[in-house]
Amino acid sequence: MVFKTLRRTLWLTLAALLAVFQFNLGAAQAAELTAETRTVKLNPQGDNVTLSLKQVAEGKQLFAYACGQCHVGGITKTDPNVGLDPEALALATPPRDSVESLVDYLHNPTTYDGEREISELHPSTKSTDIFPKMRNLTEDDLVAISGHILLQPKIVGTKWGGGKIYY
């Protein structure tokens, strides 16, 4: 009986340590990114923005919370032909390859060709009744998430949006 209790306590302690390590690892990884790496496209006009270390860490966490269920690794589970890789984002109509255009998409999602509004099918600030994880996301949160999406190809390369061949 004592052995079972000891073993259970050991496993719980190990799980807690791993959780703490995982949480702190994201902040440590963000701190290692240079300003050049953290610079992403701000708008369709081609202006750039350098994400703060806080935005990078929050973007990663918020993406995992609100988007990761369907977009882990930059893929789209419901449509493997459309990912979050730079090429797919640039070829969307309108292009979704900047922070401002991704934030717009999170407010007003449309099909890849831009012809139909899909807020009832894709999480957005319009559909918080259907997708409650979007309820409490602020504009700053949406900017951080968008920055995370644009930053990932610089960090993980072609793995981001690459699909099953990488994960």
From Swiss-Prot:
It is found in: Cellular thylakoid membrane. It comes from the Bacteria. Its cofactor is heme c. One of its GO terms (biological process) is photosynthesis, light reaction. InterPro entries: Cyt_c-like_dom (IPR009056), Cyt_c-like_dom_sf (IPR036909), Cytochrom_C550 (IPR029490), PsbV_cyt_c550 (IPR017851), PsbV_cyt_c550-like (IPR016003). Gene3D superfamilies: Cytochrome c-like domain (1.10.760.10). Keywords: Electron transport, Heme, Iron, Membrane, Metal-binding, Photosynthesis, Photosystem II, Signal, Thylakoid, Transport. Residues 1-30 form the signal peptide. SUPFAM superfamilies: Cytochrome c. This is Photosystem II extrinsic protein V. It comes from Synechococcus elongatus (strain ATCC 33912 / PCC 7942 / FACHB-805) (Anacystis nidulans R2).
